[in-house]
Amino acid sequence: MRVTAKSDYALRALIEIARRTDGAPVSAEELGRLQDIPHGFLQAILADLRRAGVVIAQRGQSGGWRLNKDADDVSVADVIRAVDGPLVSVYGMRPESVEYNAAAAVLQHVWIAGRSSLRDVFENVSVRQLADGKLPKAVTTRTADDDAWQSGDARQA
């Protein structure tokens, strides 16, 4: 899986918004400055998040962006889907929708298993956990394994 800049920036912006203990809106300019996100790109990302119901915009001099849901109720998977679509796609389609001939049908099981593994992590990590820097044990256990930090190429060496 490739994590796009769009998903990474969206999560970084949401971490900044969720860290505001007073719930005050944060301007796009401030979000961009704090996380070094290009302004135009950030505006498009925030629009995607607004359409998905994750954030709301507040107009006016003290306006900006706020979460539209509790940060505990917004998962990493929700954010990725809001800005990039399905967690796993094959030729732009969900894996279960791809038709294979008999010899290659086994690939569908691989793609669906991969999506299931991604869901195990992405659906169980909330924006609140990211903002607080407190990841669930399922994530910290996986990252405690030294092999988790190695790319496939490095492990084969």
Language model features with spans:
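Short amphipathic alpha-helical interface segments
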Residues: 10-22
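C-terminal regulatory/oligomerization modules of transcriptional regulators
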Residues: 95-157
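A short alpha-helical element within helix-turn-helix/winged-helix DNA-binding domains
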Residues: 26-36
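The C-terminal cap of the DNA-recognition helix in HTH/winged-HTH DNA-binding domains
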Residues: 19-22, 33, 51
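Conserved segment of winged-helix/HTH DNA-binding domains
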Residues: 71-96, 108, 112-115
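Short coil turns linking two alpha-helices in DNA-binding domains
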Residues: 38-41
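Basic amphipathic alpha-helical segments that dock to polyanions
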Residues: 45-52
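Beta-hairpin "wing" of winged helix-turn-helix
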Residues: 53-68
